[in-house]
C-alpha cells in the first residue's frame, strides 16, 4: 500500500495499531500495508486519483544533480530525503537475509541516478 490518502477501518487499527513511529515521512504507508496484509486485512485501491498536491521543491531533493555532492549528502537524512533510521528499519524488517545490501543499495542507487 502506497498512498497519501488512506482510509483504515477501525478493526484494522484495533488489530495492528497505528503507523510505526519510526517512519517520519517515507515508507510508513508501505510498512502499514505490509503489516495489515500479514494480519489478514484486505487492501483495496481506488481506480483513480483521490487527491492532488504540489510536487516537492526540487532544490530540497537529495538526488537533484544540480546540487553539489556536499549539499546532497546534507539533504539525504532529512524527512524528504532518505533518512537513515527509518530506511534502516524498513530494510531490516522487509529485506530478508540480504537486508544490509538492500539498505546500502538505496543510497548508492540514488546517488548514481543523480550523477548519470
Positions of predicted regions on the chain:
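A short, conserved alpha-helix in the catalytic core of glycosyltransferases
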Residues: 6-17, 22-49
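Active-site-adjacent helix/loop segment of glycosyltransferases
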Residues: 34, 38-114
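A recurrent flexible, glycine/aromatic-enriched loop bordering the glycosyltransferase active site
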Residues: 1-11, 74-75
Amino acid at each position: 500500500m502506497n498512498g497519501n490518502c488512506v482510509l483504515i477501518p477501525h478493526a484494522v487499527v484495533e488489530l495492528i495499531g497505528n503507523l510505526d513511529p519510526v517512519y517520519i515521512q517515507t515508507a510508513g504507508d508501505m510498512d502499514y500495508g505490509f503489516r495489515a496484509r500479514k494480519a489478514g486485512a484486505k487492501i483495496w485501491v481506488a481506480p483513480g486519483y483521490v487527491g492532488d498536491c504540489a510536487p516537492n521543491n526540487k532544490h530540497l531533493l537529495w538526488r537533484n544533480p544540480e546540487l553539489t555532492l556536499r549539499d546532497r549528502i546534507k539533504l539525504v537524512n532529512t524527512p524528504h530525503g532518505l533518512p537513515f533510521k527509518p530506511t534502516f528499519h524498513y530494510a531490516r524488517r522487509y529485506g530478508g537475509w540480504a537486508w544490509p545490501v538492500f539498505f546500502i543499495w538505496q543510497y548508492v542507487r540514488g546517488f548514481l541516478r543523480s550523477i548519470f
